Amino acid sequence: MSDTTNDRLDVLAVGPHPDDLEITCGGTLAKLVRQGYRVGLLDLTSGEPTPRGTEELRAREAEAARQVLGVPLRLNAGLPNRELMDVPANRYVLATLFRRLRPSVVLSVAGRTPAASPDHHQAHLLIEAARFWSQLTKWDDRFGDTRPFRVPHLVYAPFPFDAEVRHWHSTFVLDITDTFAQKLAAIRCYASQFDEARFAKVSHFVTGHAIATGSRCGFAYGELFALPHPVGASDLHALVHGGKGSPAPVPLPQDPAQPPQ
């Protein structure tokens, strides 16, 4: 991909392992594609080693999930799983990718997950740092001779099992009622990580979280996002009302065991 305006991504979602983006924001990614935005996925590591996975199998699963979500581009940064750290060498790799892909929005996983991989929190820190480094001048030789680029917008997709209750500057919820089934189907692609018994537990948790998140805004299913700054607006009515027309009717939540068709 070149760095011309026509090739730039609208949204680049970045996570540490294949399956993290599907769990945190899979419904929104599928919705962005349906809305006509240019979307890319970037896994920082292969996710291996794991007890039942291999590099080749995880790559096939990630590709299958990409197809389910309808996202046209999925890349892997090749950083080490289990040892992912926010260190200068990794910042160079990720900042170089930001310079090459030149996204308008970087969608970053966020949160501390002590019951799961520490890679999750390190990815959060690394993405923030690489976003800053990607704009630095007089260092082009450290970024593969790519041109400096500042990612205009950073949006957090918090892990639903974050260990902390965070006080973000701003949060909002995306309605994923029409893409929730795609989200679950994409997660199910990772059979090496989620056998039938474990997928049933993950599906139950993800479904319950999406219902609880969406219900706060009148949606059947929702995904939470956060910003590192307050929301700016010039029209209070449009901001809270969603436009000048009458709001669309809100669908009622379905049975958690029955995702929308």
Where in this protein do the model-derived segments appear?
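Active-site rim/loop-helix segments in enzyme catalytic domains that contact anionic ligands
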Residues: 1-102, 238-239, 243-245
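Metal-dependent de-N-acetylase/amidase catalytic core
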Residues: 2-12, 88-261
